[in-house]
Amino acid sequence: MRKWGSAGMVTVLLVLILTACTGGSTNGSNVVQLEFFQNKPEAKASFDELIAKFNKEHPNIRVSQVNPPDAETVLKTRVVKNAVPDIIGMGATDTYSLLAQSGIFLNLTNDPLLKKVNPQYVQMLNDVTGMQEVTGVPFALNASGIIYNKAIFEKLNLSVPKTWDELIATAQKAKDAGVIPFYFTYKDDWQSNLPFNDMGGSLVGIDFYKERRENKTTFQAAYQEVAKKQLELLNYGHSDNFGKGYSDGNRAFGNGQAAMYIQGSWAISEIRKVNPDIKLGFFPLPASNDESQTKLTAGVDTLLAISAQTEHPEEAKQFLSFLLEPENSQQYIDQQNLFSAVDGVQQKDDSVSGLLPYFEQGKIVDFVDHYIPSAVQLNPTVQAFLQNKDINGFLSTLDKEWDKVAARRAS
C-alpha cells in the first residue's frame, strides 16, 4: 500500500532524528535508565505495578514511567525538541502512522518479540502505517460494540440480535415496553463516533481507506448506508441524546436505565463502579442482515515501540519481552478490561464472553477512525451530522476535509 504522509513533516522529523538526543542513560552506578512514555492515564497504575516488578527482577535496569495529559501532543512536541523517549506505548492511530513513517521508531520487523503476538494484530499496524516494516509490538486491544443489560433482556424476553433487522426489532420491543433501547451520550462528540466506527468497519471495510488515500473512492460514494443507519438508531435513544455525556451514560446504564449501550470495552469498569452487581453482556453491532459478515470492531489500544536512537535498545527489548510474558499480559488486561495481543492470553471476564469467538475466528476489523487524520475533525463532524441529519452535507464535509489534509501532507 502506498504511504500517505506529509513529505514535509516526515523530512523535518528525519532531520531532527539524525541529530536527536536520546532519553536513555546510565548513571554512576551503571544502572541503565529507561523512560517509558505512554498515553493512557487510566493505565498508569497498572503499568506502575509491572514496572516495579521489572525493576526488582532487573537490578541493572531502571524503567521510569511518564504519562502526561494530552500525551500524543506532548510526544509530537518532544520529537520536534529532539527528546524522544526510549520506549513508547500508544494506540495505533494516525499519529503513530506519521511517527512511524518519519523513522523515529526502531525497526522490529524480524525481531523475536513479534513471535509472541498474534500476527493479525501486527498486520493492523502495517495497515495503519502503510509500511512493510514493523515498528511496534501490539500489546493490548480494545473492542467496541453493544453492551447490554442481561436482566432487562431476560425480563423482556429479548435475544441477542444477529442481524440489523433483529437489532432494530429488539430496540422496538424495548421501546414498546417503556424501556430506553439505547442510552446515547452524544454531548461528548467522540461518543457519536462509536456507531460510525462499528458500521464503517463492517459495511465498508478498511480497504476503503487505502483507496481513499489514492483518490479512488469517496465517503460520498461509500458511506451512504452507514450514515442512514446511524440516523435510524437515533429513533431508539432517550429524550436528551445530545445533553448526556460519557460519564452520564455510565451512571445511567449502571443504574439500569437502558437495555443497550453502544460503547467500548473500556466502559465496563466504569459501569461497575456504579453497580458492582450488574450483569452485563456484549455483542458486536450487526450492521447488515448477513450474519456471516458481522465482525467485531477491535483495534490496538496499546502498542510498544522503541526509539530508533535509544542508547539502550537491548535493555528496552528486555522490558518489552517482560510485558509480553503471559502472566504480565494477563494482569494488565484483567485490570484494564482489555484483550491481549499475546498468543494464548484471554480475557476471562464473563461480560465479554460473547466476543471471544470473534477474536478466536479472526472475525475482527480495526476502528476506522485509526485511518482518519485527526485534522479531519471526524468526531465533531459526526456529532453535527446527527443533529442536522444532512447525509450529503456530512459525507461531503468528510471528503473536503480529507482532501485538505492530503494536500497539506503532500506539499
Describe the residue ranges of each PLM region.
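Glycine-centered hinge/linker elements that transmit conformational signals in sensory
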Residues: 173-174, 213-242
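Extracytoplasmic "Venus flytrap"/periplasmic binding protein-like
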Residues: 53-120, 151, 155-162, 259-260, ...
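Conserved C-terminal helix/tail region of periplasmic/extracytoplasmic solute-binding proteins
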Residues: 154, 330, 357-411
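Short, low-complexity disordered leader/linker segments with a strong preference
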Residues: 1-34, 56, 113, 344-347, ...
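Hinge/lid segment of periplasmic solute-binding proteins
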Residues: 91-144, 168, 174-176, 195-197, ...
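Extracytoplasmic/periplasmic substrate-recognition and gating elements
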Residues: 52, 56-57, 62, 156, ...
